[in-house]
């Protein structure tokens, strides 16, 4: 293999730049040229492709976002549109592609693989919802961003004796809510994977109040429903002074944590190794702190699951 491409797609996550850097430097170490594809699959279709050198990825390992930019490209689901992308890859002499992103990005890589072009997926999403890996690039940074925000909100909640409902990202996966809620001692954690009884939530809050608790924190993943509606329901049912905070896109930004930088470096380099070995159609991950790779089609057939033991622990500790 003489030449590979790399792109980032979908929602950005801290550590994507570290992964790009690892792909470029690992490939050049093996005398392979690397071409960056800008704006994800949209840039692939339009031919926004440029050669990357060692200097192209200097001074980016500590930066959030993605040097290659990113975009969503729903039209890439069309086989004819994908053929245009493959034509662009062949036009530039690119023989393999590293795709850094989440579920939608993996779907694109899977489709390219099925159409005969070798791709390797690298899990880059703050949601931590990609099958075949314990952690995704960006999750740890986003988690620490959320924890820092909740710590600050708890200070004001304590001062004003208020109940706070805090909405975090996670449309289909509750990992951010669960990990942050457990780390911050939230009184209640609501996630899409687990049904909840609003009457039980209110009863828990009232029990806390009866034993002298002056404030409470409820962490809600966005996929559960409107945090504003949940906050109104709580205030009406308890008469507690209740506020709602939606953390939003602040969770995606910021300098990546050491863990995300190292994870991204390991996974990006491993993706290049797989392409060199002629193993396209794979996705890389980390399980039990060991690098692994899976068939991307088989991986996407699996479903991300929440850590049931951790969820149960959060309930037991929030009595």
From Swiss-Prot:
UniProt: ADP binding residues: 21-25, 154, 185-187, 211, 213-215
Gene3D superfamilies listed in its UniProt record: 3.40.50.450, Phosphofructokinase domain
Active site residues according to the UniProt entry: 127
SUPFAM superfamilies with a match to the protein in the record: Phosphofructokinase (SSF53784)
GO cellular component labels: 6-phosphofructokinase complex
Domain of life the protein comes from: Bacteria
Pfam family, one: PFK
UniProt EC number: 2.7.1.11
Subcellular location: Cytoplasm
Binding residue positions for ATP: 11, 72-73, 102-105
Protein's UniProt keywords contain ATP-binding: yes
Pathway: Carbohydrate degradation; glycolysis; D-glyceraldehyde 3-phosphate and glycerone phosphate from D-glucose: step 3/4
Class in the EC hierarchy, top level: transferase
Principal subcellular localisation of the protein: cytoplasm
Catalyzed reactions: beta-D-fructose 6-phosphate + ATP = beta-D-fructose 1,6-bisphosphate + ADP + H(+)
Binding site for substrate: 125-127, 162, 169-171, 222, 243, 249-252
Similarity remark: Belongs to the phosphofructokinase type A (PFKA) family. ATP-dependent PFK group I subfamily. Prokaryotic clade 'B1' sub-subfamily.
Quaternary state and interactors: Homotetramer.
Function: Catalyzes the phosphorylation of D-fructose 6-phosphate to fructose 1,6-bisphosphate by ATP, the first committing step of glycolysis.
HAMAP family per UniProt: Phosphofructokinase_I_B1
Protein name: ATP-dependent 6-phosphofructokinase
Organism annotation: Bacillus cereus (strain B4264)
Gene: pfkA
């Amino acid at each position: 293999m003489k030449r590979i491409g790399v792109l980032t797609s979908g929602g950005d996550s801290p550590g994507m730049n570290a992964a790009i850097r690892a792909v470029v430097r690992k490939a050049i170490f093996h005398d392979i040229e690397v071409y960056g594809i800008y704006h994800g699959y949209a840039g692939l279709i339009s031919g926004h492709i440029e050669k990357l050198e060692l200097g192209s990825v200097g001074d980016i390992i500590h930066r959030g976002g993605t040097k290659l930019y990113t975009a969503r490209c729903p039209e890439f689901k069309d086989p004819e549109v994908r053929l245009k992308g493959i034509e662009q890859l062949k036009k530039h002499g690119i023989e393999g592609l590293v795709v850094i992103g989440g579920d939608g990005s993996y779907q694109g890589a899977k489709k390219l693989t099925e159409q005969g072009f070798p791709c390797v997926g690298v899990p880059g999403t703050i949601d931590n919802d990609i099958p075949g890996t314990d952690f995704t690039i960006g999750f740890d940074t986003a988690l620490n961003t959320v924890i820092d925000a909740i710590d600050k909100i708890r200070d004001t909640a304590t001062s004003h004796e208020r109940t706070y409902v805090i909405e975090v990202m996670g449309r289909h996966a509750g990992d951010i809510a669960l990990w942050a809620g457990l780390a911050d001692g939230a009184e209640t954690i609501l996630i899409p994977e687990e049904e909840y009884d609003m009457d039980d939530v209110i009863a828990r809050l009232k029990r806390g109040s009866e034993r002298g608790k002056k404030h409470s924190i409820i962490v809600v993943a966005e996929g559960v429903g409107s945090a504003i509606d949940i906050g109104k329901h709580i205030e009406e049912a308890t008469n507690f002074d209740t506020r709602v905070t939606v953390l939003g896109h602040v969770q995606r930004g910021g300098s990546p944590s050491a863990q995300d930088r190292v994870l991204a470096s390991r996974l990006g380099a491993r993706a290049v190794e797989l392409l060199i070995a002629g193993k396209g159609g794979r996705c890389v991950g980390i399980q039990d702190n060991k690098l692994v790779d899976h068939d991307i089609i088989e991986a996407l057939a699996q479903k991300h699951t929440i850590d049931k033991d951790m969820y149960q622990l959060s309930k037991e500790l929030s009595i």
